[in-house]
């Protein structure tokens, strides 16, 4: 199926405030389907935790809505002198809770929620399906039903330690999904390009092994010839490839009955 990027870019979302922190409003942007949805896909942008915005994944969220799901793109606090990934994770947890509430109010039912994240956003997407990490933020938070991890960061103990202001080994491991997998975590689709020079493919394989050891259902799909951030339009790959990959993910989620 050909994905019409231009049409997706011309689709406008509804904006919702999900929390206010120190006077700063944080928003999520929702695209609604024309039919009764089976599920919701929450898209989380990358940018190394220091740049980019929710708008980056508007076309992807709009596509999920076009295919019958509620598509959402969320913003979160970027790292700064006073914030790190713990703040961003707190925001993402708050956003999921607010989105679930909105979905129930709008449709009168609960539905599967999928976290879909690219790179640094993949980190947050994975965290949202990880029981230990979510409970550190909110004891009452229910993890997402499924995770789509697109070349996501899973280990803060090496080159990605800058994501956390604390550099103690204990804290770095506590906020690394790789070291916090447990039985009952959300089933996961891991997708990683074999030409990724930003987040090492080996990290995806290590995470797959960690999930396997704990009996967490998952699929690891290695994309031949794909570089980092292969899901972004107008970036490293041509838009035909990006669209085909997005359509494949959508079909995969439909096959799993999440959307």
Please annotate each region the language model reported.
Residues 166-180, 185-186:
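Active-site nucleophile elbow and catalytic-triad environment of alpha/beta-hydrolase enzymes
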Residues 1-36:
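N-terminal cap/lid segment of alpha/beta-hydrolase-fold proteins
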Residues 184, 190-192, 196:
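Short beta-strand/loop motif that positions the catalytic acidic residue
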Residues 212-259:
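C-terminal catalytic histidine-bearing segment of alpha/beta-hydrolase fold enzymes
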Residues 38-47:
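Short beta-strand element of the alpha/beta-hydrolase
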Residues 97-162, 172-173:
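Primarily recognizes the serine-hydrolase "nucleophile elbow" in alpha/beta-hydrolase
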Residues 197-206:
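Conserved alpha/beta-hydrolase "acid-adjacent" motif
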Residues 52-60, 72-111, 236-241:
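Catalytic nucleophile-loop/oxyanion-hole region of alpha/beta-hydrolase
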């Amino acid at each position: 199926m050909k994905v019409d990027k231009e049409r997706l870019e011309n689709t406008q979302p509804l904006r919702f405030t999900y929390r206010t922190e120190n006077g700063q409003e944080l928003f999520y942007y929702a695209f609604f389907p024309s039919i009764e949805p089976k599920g919701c896909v929450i898209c989380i942008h990358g940018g190394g935790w220091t740049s980019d915005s929710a708008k980056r994944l508007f076309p992807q969220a709009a596509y999920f809505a076009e295919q019958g799901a509620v598509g959402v793109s969320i913003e979160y606090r970027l790292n700064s002198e006073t914030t790190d990934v713990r703040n961003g994770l707190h925001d993402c947890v708050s956003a999921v809770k607010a989105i679930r509430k909105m979905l129930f109010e709008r449709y009168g039912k609960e539905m599967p929620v999928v976290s879909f994240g690219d790179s640094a956003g993949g980190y947050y997407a994975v965290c949202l399906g990880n029981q230990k990490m979510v409970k550190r933020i909110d004891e009452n938070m229910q993890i997402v039903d499924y995770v789509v991890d697109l070349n996501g960061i899973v280990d803060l103990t090496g080159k990605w330690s800058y994501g956390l202001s604390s550099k103690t080994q204990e804290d770095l491991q506590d906020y690394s999904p790789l070291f916090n997998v447990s039985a009952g975590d959300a089933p996961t689709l891991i997708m990683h390009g074999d030409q990724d020079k930003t987040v090492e493919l080996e990290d995806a394989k290590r995470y797959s092994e960690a999930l396997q050891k704990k009996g967490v259902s998952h699929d690891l799909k290695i994309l031949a010839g794909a570089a980092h951030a292969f899901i972004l339009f107008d970036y490293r790959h041509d838009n035909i490839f990006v669209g085909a990959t997005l359509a494949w993910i959508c079909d995969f989620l439909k096959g799993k009955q999440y959307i």
